[in-house]
A protein has these predicted regions:
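Short membrane-interface helical motifs at transmembrane helix boundaries
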Residues: 99-121, 321-341, 459-463
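Alpha-helical transmembrane segments of multi-pass membrane transporters/permeases
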Residues: 12-13, 136, 147-177, 357, ...
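Alpha-helical transmembrane segments of multi-pass membrane proteins
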Residues: 119-146, 340-368, 480
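Transmembrane helical elements of multi-pass membrane transporters/channels
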Residues: 7-31, 194, 198, 202-205, ...
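Membrane-proximal transmembrane or re-entrant/amphipathic helices at the cytosolic face
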Residues: 459-512
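Interhelical loop/hinge segments that connect adjacent transmembrane helices in multipass membrane
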Residues: 1-5, 203-241, 299, 429-447
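Membrane-interface helix-loop junctions in multi-pass transport and translocation proteins
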Residues: 158, 166-200, 204, 388-421, ...
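Helix-loop junctions and terminal segments of transmembrane helices
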Residues: 58-74, 279-297, 302-305, 369
Length: 512
């Protein structure tokens, strides 16, 4: 079990890290070209709006996994193929309908959700046109999500993990060679091409499983109906990050449109670590949990859950603390060039500080949500999703006038903490989850190792900044120095404290 989690997670992490490196270059070029100006706000708003609808399609990945796993565990290969074909056809038709409706409503969407942009007729026209182009991407999301889910169930992680890398390469190539020629509107076309490639990259791996697509349209299919019944709570929960950010974008735009860009870059930084590590672990763990539930192996199920949370904490607790200490040089290295000034970097790093806790919060919350999906308990998921949306608005909206744009990050973080706790206790009751003394001892060891790491990193950072200015070159240097020292000290501390999960990872690497 632990070998499956580690081996699969490593594959996903490698591709995700490569994707994020390309994404950082992409965002850096975007910041250099547009800074925190209106064109960047228009692109960010359009992309955020598109991703909100795209996340609906991504819910299909989680919806199909338990249904497919149950059929597969009963050796019903033909029924598995029929389920996939029918789901692809039906979901793609519905996606096309959504695209038509979204294109028609692009104007009102901009007026309601980006009022500051809509006040200028030229910017309004740009935003509407860009939004309509990007909405076409949604057509490719449904088949892409379904194929990715099937491949994950069959422990084929390379193609699904490489999707983001492929699309980010498209965006980077466009920015380097074509942005000055075709501008923001051409970027919208590049986004559509990127989503098509994300679908196409899964097709060869899917065909190697022996499956072939055949047109099938049967709304009465039992498997499809099962997916349909669970889809709304799954889609709502898988869209929570996008919905919450959309609410925050609307609140931020009502005060200052440039806060949209600050929110976007801060979110991208926190999401980078969340996606590289937590998504990698959870992508592997979720099919495993669904399979164990289908086989009624609840002892191993609870073991896999606890093990996954430990792996997340081992990696992301020190990462979160390190990012909090080095937030200014990190954002300077990431963004400070061209139109993006040091003042903008300071503003963004201040905002980032309040968003950093969401790295851990979202990671743990994600694995808890996937537990409820695998247990087919969508009622709790639905309640938690609604609570997240409501609390995001209730907490953030009153704060915006009192503490400015940082209220967006604070509201987002507080909402995450409350809703994570709301997930833990029902799950504890449902599967009789017990955290024993050894688990608590391991957690304490991870915290101690993180403290041991953070003190010298903080001292090195302060020593460096007392002698050198934080330009882009020096920022990269201090990140490298602190990063190397931090990783070495943390690993030595973990090994000295005898954290079992570290021994497991080392043994697996030795035996490869």
């Amino acid at each position: 079990m632990k070998n499956k989690i580690i081996n699969g997670s490593v594959i996903v992490m490698i591709f995700t890290i490569a994707s994020k490196v390309v994404a950082l270059l992409r965002d850096s070029l975007m910041a250099s070209n547009f800074g925190t100006g209106t064109e960047n706000s228009i692109f960010t708003f359009s992309m955020r709006s598109t991703m909100l609808l795209v996340s609906i399609g991504y819910g299909l990945t989680m919806a199909i996994v338990p249904v497919y796993s149950k059929l597969d565990s009963n050796n019903k290969g033909k029924e598995c193929e029929e389920l996939v074909n029918n789901t692809i056809t039906v979901s793609t038709i519905f996606a096309a309908i959504i695209v038509v409706i979204a294109v028609i409503l692009a104007g009102p969407i901009v007026k309601v959700m980006a009022s500051d942009i809509a006040m200028n007729p030229v910017y309004y026209s740009q935003a509407v046109s860009l939004l309509r182009i990007m909405f076409i991407s949604i057509i490719f999301v449904a088949p892409q999500s379904i194929l990715a889910g099937v491949l994950q169930c069959n422990n084929k992680f390379i193609a699904p993990a490489s999707m983001s890398l492929c699309s980010n390469l498209v965006y980077l190539i466009y920015q380097v060679f074509l942005l000055k020629i075709y501008g923001i509107m051409g970027y919208g076309v590049a986004v559509v091409i990127g989503f098509f490639i994300m679908f196409a990259v899964n097709v060869p791996a899917y065909r190697k499983l022996g499956y072939r697509y055949k047109f099938s349209f049967n709304l009465k299919d039992r498997g499809l109906r099962k997916i349909g019944e669970s889809l709304f709570p799954i889609v709502l929960s898988s869209s929570l990050v996008q919905i919450s950010l959309y609410i925050l974008t609307a609140i931020g735009a009502s005060v200052d449109s440039s806060s949209i860009v600050i929110l976007d870059y801060s979110n991208k930084m926190t999401m980078m670590f969340y996606e590289v590590f937590a998504i990698a672990i959870n992508m592997v763990t979720y099919p495993l949990l669904s399979s164990l539930k289908a086989q009624n192996e609840m002892g191993e199920y609870k073991g896999a859950l606890i093990k996954s949370v430990k792996y997340i904490l081992i990696v992301l607790l020190p990462v979160s603390i390190g990012l909090a200490i080095l937030r200014l040089p990190v954002m300077a290295a990431y963004l400070m060039r061209g139109e993006f000034t040091f003042e903008s970097v300071e503003r963004t790093s201040s905002f980032l500080l309040f968003m950093i806790p969401t790295i851990l919060i979202l990671s743990i919350k994600d694995i808890l949500l996937r537990c409820f999906f695998s247990l087919d308990n969508n009622r709790i998921v639905l309640k938690n999703s609604i609570a997240t949306i409501v609390l995001t608005f209730i907490i953030t909206y009153p704060l915006r006038r009192m503490i400015g744009e940082n209220s967006l990050a604070i509201g987002y973080t507080l909402t995450g903490i409350v809703t994570m706790i709301m997930l833990y206790y029902p799950l504890k009751k449902e599967i009789a989850l017990k955290i024993n003394a050894k688990d608590l001892k391991d957690l304490l060891k991870i915290v101690i190792a993180t403290i041991i790491m953070s003190v010298p990193v903080y001292l090195i950072y302060n020593l460096f900044t007392s002698y050198f200015a934080l330009n882009t070159k020096n920022s990269i240097l201090i990140i490298g120095i602190c990063g190397i020292f931090g990783v070495l000290i943390y690993l030595i501390a973990l090994i000295t404290l005898r954290v079992d999960e570290v021994k497991e990872i080392i043994n697996i690497i030795k035996n490869r």
